[in-house]
């Protein structure tokens, strides 16, 4: 079935449809990973976006039951060069085509995704649509289409739920979390309580947490202003750790600014340097916004990590509080596990804070 990928600037790419047969509109973004398409499609950080893969063959190992990063994918569409006709993997449960149909996500193939990526890198991120027919007003209608900005509310859990264990009590504030974050914390025996994105500081502190995690999520951090007051209050009392969107919200809550990147970081080969040690980790990333480096000068935040290629702020730490964040995904999924030691640093921070509190009680 003939379909078209139409960009906001009027560029049109003809291709062949697969997945759901509906039309769609979203921001077109590209992922440079050579694998991990299942984890990416089910990552809530892609909510509202049309996800394009630069690797030329997608779907060759199918979709399995284990690697979902969320229950329901929310990306608006999938763009590939070629979809594998047959999936070959012992865990394969269904084809990519069937999975997209099942979840009402349209796809388009036979697209030169590397050429489209070069176009996006030059022109910047823009809206796009996948349609069966290009009409005279298709581009004009695309230009005036307002994309949904309430994506965090859509991606977050509506109800609190536990993931019990015997270790430290960690409250996870869900802005669109990946299951791999919960897995990494569970590996370290954290007793988890996952809460909606709009939970207040008083509601969090009523659970007597040993630490608070701010997860990844979709969209512009400035569209979640209610989280900032919660962060400002919580960081005074217990260790706090933010990832991706959580990192950006942590920065905003402490007086820094964020900005929309030209085309973002989406892939899992991004080199990040830890400034204090010079250690370099290859990291998994998925973000279209970043912290403004210059805006940090008048805050109590210190830069701990930076992206080697373009200098993006990749890590922050508070001068006075036991609070820190990273822009990248130390949980990987997909990608390298170079940076999973960051979770151990969170565990150590909680242990040190508990020891300090016990010492204060003893001295009193």
Curated annotation (Swiss-Prot):
GO BP, one annotated term: glutamine metabolic process
NCBIfam families: CPSaseIIsmall, PRK12838.1
SMART domains from the UniProt entry: CPSase_sm_chain
This enzyme's EC code(s): 6.3.5.5
Active site: 244 (nucleophile), 329, 331
Family: Belongs to the CarA family.
InterPro entries cross-referenced by the UniProt entry: Anth_synth/Amidotransfase (IPR050472), CarbamoylP_synth_ssu (IPR006274), CarbamoylP_synth_ssu_N (IPR002474), CarbP_synth_ssu_N_sf (IPR036480), Class_I_gatase-like (IPR029062), CPSase_GATase1 (IPR035686), GATASE (IPR017926)
Keywords: ATP-binding, Glutamine amidotransferase, Ligase, Nucleotide-binding, Pyrimidine biosynthesis
Catalytic activity line of the entry: hydrogencarbonate + L-glutamine + 2 ATP + H2O = carbamoyl phosphate + L-glutamate + 2 ADP + phosphate + 2 H(+)
Domain Glutamine amidotransferase type-1: 169-356
Coiled-coil residue spans: none
Organism: Lactiplantibacillus plantarum (strain ATCC BAA-793 / NCIMB 8826 / WCFS1) (Lactobacillus plantarum)
Role summary: Small subunit of the glutamine-dependent carbamoyl phosphate synthetase (CPSase). CPSase catalyzes the formation of carbamoyl phosphate from the ammonia moiety of glutamine, carbonate, and phosphate donated by ATP, constituting the first step of the biosynthetic pathway leading to pyrimidine nucleotides. The small subunit (glutamine amidotransferase) binds and cleaves glutamine to supply the large subunit with the substrate ammonia.
GO molecular function: ATP binding; carbamoyl-phosphate synthase (glutamine-hydrolyzing) activity; glutaminase activity
Region CPSase: start-end pairs: 1-169
Pathway involvement of the protein, from the record: Pyrimidine metabolism; UMP biosynthesis via de novo pathway; (S)-dihydroorotate from bicarbonate: step 1/3
Gene label: pyrAA
Name of the protein this chain belongs to: Carbamoyl phosphate synthase pyrimidine-specific small chain
Subunit structure: Composed of two chains; the small (or glutamine) chain promotes the hydrolysis of glutamine to ammonia, which is used by the large (or ammonia) chain to synthesize carbamoyl phosphate. Tetramer of heterodimers (alpha,beta)4.
Activity regulation (UniProt): Inhibited by pyrimidine.
């Amino acid at each position: 079935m003939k379909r078209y990928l139409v960009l906001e600037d009027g560029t049109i790419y003809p291709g062949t449809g697969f997945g759901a047969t509906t039309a769609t509109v979203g921001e077109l973004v590209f992922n440079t990973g050579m694998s991990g398409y299942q984890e990416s499609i089910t990552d809530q950080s892609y909510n509202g976006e049309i996800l394009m893969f630069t690797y030329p063959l997608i779907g060759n190992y199918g979709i399995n039951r284990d690697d979902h990063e969320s229950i329901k994918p929310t990306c608006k569409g999938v763009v590939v060069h070629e979809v594998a006709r047959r999936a070959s993997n012992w865990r394969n449960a269904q084809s990519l085509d069937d999975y997209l149909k099942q979840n009402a996500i349209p796809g388009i193939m036979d697209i030169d995704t590397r050429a489209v990526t070069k176009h996006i890198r030059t022109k910047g991120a823009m809206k796009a649509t996948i349609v069966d027919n290009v009409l005279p007003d298709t581009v004009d209608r695309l230009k005036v289409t307002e994309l949904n900005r309430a994506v965090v509310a859509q991606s977050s859990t509506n109800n609190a739920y536990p993931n019990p264990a015997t270790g430290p009590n960690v409250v996870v504030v869900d802005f669109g979390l990946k299951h791999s974050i919960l897995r990494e914390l569970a590996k370290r025996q954290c007793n988890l309580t996952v809460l909606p994105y709009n939970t207040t500081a008083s509601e969090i502190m009523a659970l007597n947490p040993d630490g608070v995690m701010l997860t990844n999520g979709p969209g512009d951090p400035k569209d979640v202003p209610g989280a900032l007051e919660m962060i400002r209050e919580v960081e005074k009392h217990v260790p706090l750790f933010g990832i991706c969107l959580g990192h950006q919200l942590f920065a905003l809550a402490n007086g820094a600014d964020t900005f929309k990147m030209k085309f973002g970081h989406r892939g899992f080969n991004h080199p990040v340097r830890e400034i204090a040690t010079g250690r370099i980790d290859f990291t998994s990333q998925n973000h279209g916004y970043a912290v403004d480096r210059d805006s940090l000068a008048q805050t109590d935040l210190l830069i701990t990590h930076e992206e080697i290629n373009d200098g993006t702020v990749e890590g922050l730490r508070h001068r006075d509080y036991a609070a820190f964040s990273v822009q990248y995904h130390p949980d990987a999924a997909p990608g390298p596990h170079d940076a999973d030691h960051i979770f151990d640093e969170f565990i150590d921070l909680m242990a040190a804070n508990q020891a300090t509190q016990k010492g204060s009680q003893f001295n009193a």
